[in-house]
């Protein structure tokens, strides 16, 4: 960061009170003098002179800015001198005024990520056999065929777009149940990746940076979707071909288990 002190009283005596006058008097202190006379009288061998002392002075930011503006004006003037005023002169000038300090920042600000608004949509999912997902008991989803009279038993998911390893074919999402403090998560149970419904604090979830067990990579293949566990790659949200069986986490891609889903958007 840069810090700029104030001008000394001796220098202020030579400074013009007119805000439009950006220069010190030509007969001012030798340690800070800008010789800017009539350009026609400028010595062709000397050009525009700028004398700067390495001793630190007290300068307000406004006064330093005035000097910078003045130097910019001088640099842009067409002066018939052999040496043009270069940017290196400004760098030297700044090095005498400002002191560099490192500014450290974290790659990810966890607090900021938690406070960021999370984009979400509401949807229903059906497997490849058009079985709907319903809540059985408190913490279990099952897949079964529903008729028109009980279609309202389908769970509505709140699909949140979260931080993860995003690519062209994978979009990280979290799947919560609308109106409930429940999210699908993947954990290791009995040495096997397992899908479960996990209760969460509604004041903290959803958030942009979800724990990895809550994250699924949404993969779109033609008009179907797959949901791969971010915690356990190549393990997918799956249903059985048998009616009224629990939704589970499987790695039987291409086998008898169903991992393809269709999605129906639901208005909020």
From Swiss-Prot:
Potent pro-inflammatory cytokine. Initially discovered as the major endogenous pyrogen, induces prostaglandin synthesis, neutrophil influx and activation, T-cell activation and cytokine production, B-cell activation and antibody production, and fibroblast proliferation and collagen production. Promotes Th17 differentiation of T-cells. Synergizes with IL12/interleukin-12 to induce IFNG synthesis from T-helper 1 (Th1) cells. Plays a role in angiogenesis by inducing VEGF production synergistically with TNF and IL6. Belongs to the IL-1 family. Its main location: cytoplasm. Gene3D superfamilies: 2.80.10.50. GO terms for molecular function: cytokine activity; integrin binding; interleukin-1 receptor binding. Keywords: Cytokine, Cytoplasm, Inflammatory response, Lysosome, Mitogen, Pyrogen, Secreted. One of its GO terms (cellular component) is cytosol. InterPro entries: IL-1_CS, IL-1_fam, IL-1_propep, IL1/FGF. IL1B production occurs in 2 steps, each being controlled by different stimuli. First, inflammatory signals, such as LPS, stimulate the synthesis and promote the accumulation of cytosolic stores of pro-IL1B (priming). Then additional signals are required for inflammasome assembly, leading to CASP1 activation, pro-IL1B processing and eventually secretion of the active cytokine. IL1B processing and secretion are temporarily associated. GO terms for biological process: cellular response to lipopolysaccharide; cytokine-mediated signaling pathway; fever generation; immune response; positive regulation of cell division; positive regulation of immature T cell proliferation in thymus; positive regulation of T-helper 1 cell cytokine production; positive regulation of type II interferon production. The gene is IL1B. Monomer. In its precursor form, weakly interacts with full-length MEFV; the mature cytokine does not interact at all. Interacts with integrins ITGAV:ITGBV and ITGA5:ITGB1; integrin-binding is required for IL1B signaling. Interacts with cargo receptor TMED10; the interaction is direct and is required for the secretion of IL1B mature form. Interacts with HSP90AB1; the interaction facilitates cargo translocation into the ERGIC. Interacts with HSP90B1; the interaction facilitates cargo translocation into the ERGIC. It comes from the Eukaryota. The record marks 170, 180, 189 as: Important for interaction with integrin. It is found in: Cytoplasm, Cytosol; Secreted; Lysosome; Secreted, Extracellular exosome. Residues 1-116 form a propeptide. This is Interleukin-1 beta.
